[in-house]
Amino acid sequence: MKVKLADKHGFCFGVKRAIKLAESHQGGITLGPLIHNKKEIERLKNDFGVTVEESVENLPRGSEVIIRTHGIPKDDLAKLTQSAEKIIDATCPFVTKPQKICEIMSQEGYQIIIFGDINHPEVQGVMSYSSSEPIVVMSPKELFGAKLKEKVALVSQTTKKIEDFLGVASFLVQRCAEVRIFNTICNATFDNQEAARHLSQEVDIMIIAGGKNSSNTKQLLSICLEHCQDSYLIEDESELDPQWFTNKKTCGVTAGASTPEWIIERVVRTIEGYKG
């Protein structure tokens, strides 16, 4: 089986930075999973003794705490400063951008609109920086009936599709007197999506490697399905099904921003061993 790897794929700058920080603080505790990839979280635990704690209240006093790439709510950060021995901030710089924007714009009287998943830890963190209650939506439809103010500021979860973000922006521009639009979608996310979009039009089957709880990985699957019906999301090579590749000649492979290279290499090697 011939395999084509997307030009842009895998670990982004923010994830690489976070992994290095975790590896250099052996025995540290991350507040929530550092990244959305179970296999890499297991590796950090086994090789570096880095464990995960979901709640600030359950952290042992005097701990060395690593803040996840997605950031944490403002209140949790305040609690950490009181209880942790040391705080290692692995929040992706692209995530701190919408946090700061929400803080500043809400203080200036703008109503904050966040395009993203309200249940995602990144969005929950960003929400906490707004001094007034923000509106969080996944589509323009969710804004129908919302009490929009004359002045609004729009930001996006960093891993969303630009087309969907622009749809929300267009809705607001047509209904509000003043709209401040901040494109907070990460450059690496955009590049990975574009590479996946192009590759999925050139192959018979697409494999997307990444955590099934990863927002950016699910976006890659959505994009690939637009152009290649035989697109599959897997966490590692063990989830590959040889029957998927029957009568296929070329397979495209991409990976989410939290997918380590060692998983990608195993996936590619396994697929190369299949007969179409």
From Swiss-Prot:
One of its GO terms (biological process) is terpenoid biosynthetic process. Pathway: Isoprenoid biosynthesis; dimethylallyl diphosphate biosynthesis; dimethylallyl diphosphate from (2E)-4-hydroxy-3-methylbutenyl diphosphate: step 1/1; Isoprenoid biosynthesis; isopentenyl diphosphate biosynthesis via DXP pathway; isopentenyl diphosphate from 1-deoxy-D-xylulose 5-phosphate: step 6/6. Its cofactor is [4Fe-4S] cluster. Dimethylallyl diphosphate binds at H36, H70, H120, S214, S215, N216, S258. Isopentenyl diphosphate binds at H36, H70, H120, S214, S215, N216, S258. Keywords: 4Fe-4S, Iron, Iron-sulfur, Isoprene biosynthesis, Metal-binding, Oxidoreductase. (2E)-4-hydroxy-3-methylbut-2-enyl diphosphate binds at H36, H70, H120, T158, S214, S215, N216, S258. GO terms for molecular function: 4 iron, 4 sulfur cluster binding; 4-hydroxy-3-methylbut-2-enyl diphosphate reductase activity; metal ion binding. It comes from the Bacteria. It is an enzyme of class 1 (oxidoreductase). [4Fe-4S] cluster binds at C12, C92, C186. The keyword ATP-binding does not apply. InterPro entries: LytB/IspH. It catalyses: isopentenyl diphosphate + 2 oxidized [2Fe-2S]-[ferredoxin] + H2O = (2E)-4-hydroxy-3-methylbut-2-enyl diphosphate + 2 reduced [2Fe-2S]-[ferredoxin] + 2 H(+); dimethylallyl diphosphate + 2 oxidized [2Fe-2S]-[ferredoxin] + H2O = (2E)-4-hydroxy-3-methylbut-2-enyl diphosphate + 2 reduced [2Fe-2S]-[ferredoxin] + 2 H(+). The active site is at E122 (proton donor). Its EC number is 1.17.7.4. Binds 1 [4Fe-4S] cluster per subunit. Pfam families: LYTB (PF02401). Catalyzes the conversion of 1-hydroxy-2-methyl-2-(E)-butenyl 4-diphosphate (HMBPP) into a mixture of isopentenyl diphosphate (IPP) and dimethylallyl diphosphate (DMAPP). Acts in the terminal step of the DOXP/MEP pathway for isoprenoid precursor biosynthesis. Belongs to the IspH family. This is 4-hydroxy-3-methylbut-2-enyl diphosphate reductase.
